[in-house]
Amino acid sequence: MAPSRGLQPLHFSEGFSRCRSTLQHQSRNARPLQWSLHARRTYWSFTENLSNPSNKLQSYVSRSSDPYLNLSIEDHILRKSPPDSTILFLYVNRPCVVIGRNQNPWSEVNLSILNAATGTTDLKDTEPPGIGAVELVRRRSGGGAVFHDEGNLNWSITCPRTEFTRDKHAEMVVRALRKQGIERARVNERHDIVLDQGHERRPSDPNDMHRTPYTVDDGVPKPLKVSGSAYKLTRQRALHHATTLLESPNLHIISQYLRSPAKHSIEAKGVESVSSPVSNIGLDLKAYQKRLQDVFATMYANVGKISVTATVDDEYLNIPDIRKGYDELRVRLFNLSVSVHL
């Protein structure tokens, strides 16, 4: 696809007008609440299992590709699960740009491309990549801006706050990758998962999740990032979630969405993203998803067996608490220019 042409720095008055237009477009397309007997049964089954103190280990996979819904289910898990439980949640979103709670979308995202692709503005000087509408979503955790699509598996762990470290579950993911034959995978000093690009194979400890036979200490060639994470802490709980670039068909255009033409003309507070070269891992998503579930079960085998293994889907939007979070994400996204309190 051709890159954007002739983009001008965004002015806030113009930008807010576009945001209102985008918000109206999103509101018109929001799905209605359908509170049926089946939905009530779904609610009680899911929430009862989730909040049951005897269910120390749980594993869920989403069949929905709605980023607002998946993030709202994730938040529901964080707030409703028992304080001493550990829960794995896996999901894949349709194409979207997800920014952190404390980020300024004007300096992190090419809003002109997003608005042109959704048809909310008529920008004749902007040519979006030809993959259709790409939504902008603000998550409740911190961290930087990322691109999601059908080739990216998102993993989420909710656990007791006292057991949380930024490396613990990143190392779990690396173990799963290595079991799939990806021996270059490791956790770096920023707690991201990267693929080492060294040419010479050296001896290394296979149990060390922070070095590989191809780790280069002088940083050349640079490793390629395949997973970036963020987290949210509450009084008793911790949520740690991340992307995993497995087989994204849009790797070549991600930078067009995550590079704002207004970045250098805006002076505002907010967390800036750290740009890194990225790569696909080259694994089948379904096969790796199963492997990750198995590694999670092995990692927590001392706690017991996973007592709940289930799928969630679009009907979970009918759960009032999830619907409330869903509506909050859609409405608040364009409400502030820098960051929000969620």
Residues of each region from the PLM?
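Structural beta-strand/beta-sheet cores of well-ordered domains, especially the beta-sheet scaffolds
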Residues: T86, P95-V97, L153, H191, ...
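Short beta-strand-to-turn element immediately C-terminal to the catalytic PLP-Schiff-base lysine
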Residues: I99-G100, D196, L246-E247
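FAD-binding core of FAD-dependent oxidoreductases
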Residues: R139-N154, R190-G198, K225, Y231-L239, ...
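A short, structural micro-pattern
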Residues: Y91-N93, G130, F147-D149, V187, ...
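Long, positively charged amphipathic alpha-helical accessory segments at protein N-termini or as interdomain linkers
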Residues: P3-S4, H76, E171-A185, R202-L342
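N-terminal lobe of the biotin/lipoate ligase/transferase fold
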Residues: A2-D167
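Contiguous, small/hydrophobic- and glycine-enriched helical/loop subdomains that border
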Residues: E150-G198
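Intrinsically disordered, low-complexity domain-flanking/linker segments in eukaryotic proteins
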Residues: S112-P129, Q197-K222
